[in-house]
Amino acid sequence: MFSMDSFAMDKDAKLYEGNALFRNQPSYKVFNKSFEHVDDALYTLLNEVEPDVLRMELQETGDLFKSFNRNSALRDPRNNEVPPKPTRDLTTASSLYSFPNPLEQYSELNLKQQAACMRVLLAWQCSQPVDEQDIVVWQATEKKRYNEQQRVQKYIHDHEQGRKEVIYAPMKSLVAVYRKWYELGVKKLQQTYPNDSYMTFSGLPQLPQCRSLNAQTASIEQVELERIVGRVRLLPEVEVRHEALRTLRLRLDRYATRETRAPVQLLREEDKELELEAGNVFVLPLDSLLMLLTTGSYIDLPTEMFLSLRESPNSKHKCMEFQSPFPPRNCGWHTNSLILKLAYGAYISQPGQAKWLDFNINGAVKEVPDEPACDKSSIDLQMVYKPRAIDQQPSDIEDGNCNSALVSWTLRCKGEGDDCNDFQIFSTLSIPAVKDSSGKEPLGCHFIKLENKPDCGCEIMSKYELISAWVQLKLMRAEMGHCTRISLRDFEPMLEEKLTLISLEQQLHDYYNTSMPQLLSNLCEFLKLLDTVPAGDYLLRYSPKYKDKFLLCIVTKEATPQSFQLHQLLTESIPSDQAFLTQSSYLPISPTLCGRLHEELHLLPCAFPAKANGRSVQRRKVVVPIPEPSRQAPVRRQRLKKWSEAQTREFRRRCKVDQKKRARARKTAAANKEKIELEKIMTL
């Protein structure tokens, strides 16, 4: 039996309180919270927001999404642009371009008809035979295609005018690079020419106003390639690699502002004296010739160049020498293409990018060997090491892979009867490439054209580009040139186009109503007027105030209110694209070129997308509003004579005939009105 004392001792004993580590701790319920609770550590970690992402625009309290500012979105560090989509599926081949069709308009042709017409265009584009069945479909749908082309051209014109700033937004980077290139060119001009004051001496009419009173034709004849100096690219087939375009998109500034070596003086003084014994001599570089032929056509073309008139003391004949024009002070289509062409030329000049032929001034041709990675062995301790300065800019590195060619040709102007005038002209230009190792087959021309509306198709070439390509093919005596079309948005290749003299002349006639024989005839009349100007040094200038004239400016010793200084003219304004964006310049879409957009989307050029079920969409008829009849005084009702059955049939027949005539008249009036509106658009 237990005693009472032992029971009391057990009662006073302490109970087990657990491990001392867990004493004075909160209840387990505190740690047993759900992770959806706002005080939970996991909940706080998962819902933490970076301060760079959480901006003032997104900190407002609310359950609905109110607005989104693109400035608040994260940018791609490679190109500093906002990604259009947060994700991209690289497992499937998706198109980068899509035809802008928010109103969901569809073509009058079905899928099979559009496919047949596309096969015809692709066959013509690649100079391949065309299937007879496709030709039948092409001819049967000619009227539908023509009507739809007009509607699509008007639709794309309205689309560009409404979104012009968005479409030409990628042009900002090209404008920034062009400004740096312009500054380098202006520094060279300031070092070459003194800061003299000029004033207007006389005026000369531009080429469109230099028309002969008598009917005459002009042509380029007796073309001879006198000499080539420098390195020319050896290129059997023209192909612009995608890797090069991708590099240029990220490093355009590095390659476009690289300087080139000064061109060699190809036309010797003794050659000029020999030619002056027979008649007048004109020295016209390619850029100067194009300035005379296309001045005032676009806002981003050169407007000034130096002109020197010298009279031979022996023969009394004149040597009229034009210098290269000043760089344009406004940015646009042509300055964008110029920057990209310069950058691409500097990129392929790097070792290992292309093969080159070296042309000596004596006419010798040799292939340039590939430069090794190291000229001498690393064991040679006596080798000369020339470190490059850290602060040396890429523009200070001269590019040696450039060339200059001298071409002599005769501008022959034939009038009525046996009347004929010949002008001996020497032109200098750069050869883009040669096809053979002997250098006897030069490539006529190579353009890099930027497509401003890649979602709509391939644009037609500008008048300046067409005339430039035509002149280069003539002077090089080449059968074919080349035009590489790439997208302005992302520098993706769109089309490799072949250029021929026939196609260039046809485009000039169709799009710009320009005839090259007539333009050359106007050039003959201009050179005749230039022969009457006294000898001396002049500055030939174009001003928008005098749209039909060239201004001949001479140096003046005393400054006057009408005079201007040369250096001030070059530096008074910074090149920008404001004038280009404010003008109504527009390049229509070519209806015959099938580019990357059309091949990926199976879309006919200048056509709306076809219905997915293969059915064509009938165009709605134009509804002409019927004028309300004017109120007239009530006429006293007369008793009508009952007609016979024959008279009733004849009356109904005449009513139907009149109704059809009125319907045809309404359709004709609507078609004429639409045609007039489209002609206004095409003439912009």
Curated annotation (Swiss-Prot):
Question: What are the alphabetically sorted keywords of the record?
Answer: Nucleus, Transcription, Transcription regulation
- Chain ranges passing through the membrane: none
Annotated region (Disordered) at: 69-91
Q: What is its main location?
A: nucleus
- Where is it found, in Gene Ontology cellular component terms? super elongation complex; transcription elongation factor complex
Q: Which residues form the signal peptide?
A: none
Which InterPro entries does the UniProt entry name for this protein?
Answer: ICE2_C
Function noted in UniProt: Component of the little elongation complex (LEC), a complex required to regulate small nuclear RNA (snRNA) gene transcription by RNA polymerase II and III.
Q: How does it assemble?
A: Component of the little elongation complex (LEC), at least composed of Ell, Eaf, Ice1 and Ice2.
The protein in question is named Little elongation complex subunit 2
What's the source species for this entry? Drosophila melanogaster
**Lineage start:** Eukaryota, Metazoa, Ecdysozoa, Arthropoda, Hexapoda
